[in-house]
Amino acid sequence: MPHSSDSSDSSFSRSPPPGKQDSSDDVRKVQRREKNRIAAQKSRQRQTQKADTLHLESEDLEKQNAALRKEIKQLTEELKYFTSVLSSHEPLCSVLASGTPSPPEVVYSAHAFHQPHISSPRFQP
């Protein structure tokens, strides 16, 4: 019995039968959705990690800021103290009262003999 031309033609056909085409499209859709779901999950994880990192960095910067503000306050207090010491010393200082400009070595050496203010326990190392 000879083969019908329909059966020989279908063996050389490149497109699957209509039922199989729908099935392979469904498989591709499912695979694409799964791939997209995984990509979205990874993206959310990266976003969460970035937010956590920024939060930790923010906390660290807040601590640094607080420490710097504390240091500014301390230095401001020291400036007030030394300004007060200088103000009380100026009227008693013969080197500063002379009015003639002196080299820094002379001024500092002359002042090395009377420094009761700097020996204050407040500013000892």
UniProtKB/Swiss-Prot annotation:
It holds the Pfam family bZIP_1. Residues 54-75 are annotated as: Leucine-zipper. One of its GO terms (cellular component) is RNA polymerase II transcription regulator complex. This is Basic leucine zipper transcriptional factor ATF-like. Residues 26-89 form the bZIP domain. It comes from Mus musculus (Mouse). Phosphorylated on serine and threonine residues and at least one tyrosine residue. Phosphorylation at Ser-43 inhibit DNA binding activity and transforms it as a negative regulator of AP-1 mediated transcription. The modification Phosphothreonine is found at T48. Belongs to the bZIP family. It is found in: Nucleus; Cytoplasm. InterPro entries: AP-1, bZIP, bZIP_sf. Gene3D superfamilies: 1.20.5.170. The modification Phosphoserine is found at S43. Keywords: Activator, Cytoplasm, Differentiation, DNA-binding, Nucleus, Phosphoprotein, Repressor, Transcription, Transcription regulation. Induction: Up-regulated by STAT3 in response to DNA damage. Induces by IL12 at late effector stage. Down-regulated by STAT5 in follicular T-helper cells (TfH). Residues 28-50 are annotated as: Basic motif. Residues 1-14 have a biased composition (Low complexity). Residues 1-59 are annotated as: Disordered. GO terms for biological process: defense response to protozoan; DNA damage response; DNA damage response, signal transduction by p53 class mediator; hematopoietic stem cell differentiation; isotype switching; lymphoid progenitor cell differentiation; myeloid dendritic cell differentiation; positive regulation of cytokine production. AP-1 family transcription factor that controls the differentiation of lineage-specific cells in the immune system: specifically mediates the differentiation of T-helper 17 cells (Th17), follicular T-helper cells (TfH), CD8(+) dendritic cells and class-switch recombination (CSR) in B-cells. Acts via the formation of a heterodimer with JUNB that recognizes and binds DNA sequence 5'-TGA[CG]TCA-3'. SMART domains: BRLZ. GO terms for molecular function: DNA-binding transcription activator activity, RNA polymerase II-specific; DNA-binding transcription factor activity; RNA polymerase II cis-regulatory region sequence-specific DNA binding; sequence-specific DNA binding. Heterodimer; mainly heterodimerizes with JUNB. The BATF-JUNB heterodimer interacts with IRF4 and IRF8. Interacts (via bZIP domain) with IRF4 and IRF8; the interaction is direct. Also forms heterodimers with JUN and JUND. Interacts with IFI35. Detected in postnatal and adult lymphoid tissues such as thymus, spleen and lymph nodes. In thymus most concentrated expression is found in the immediate cortical layer. Differentially expressed during T-cell development in thymus. Highly expressed in Th17, Th1 and Th2 cells and in activated B-cells.
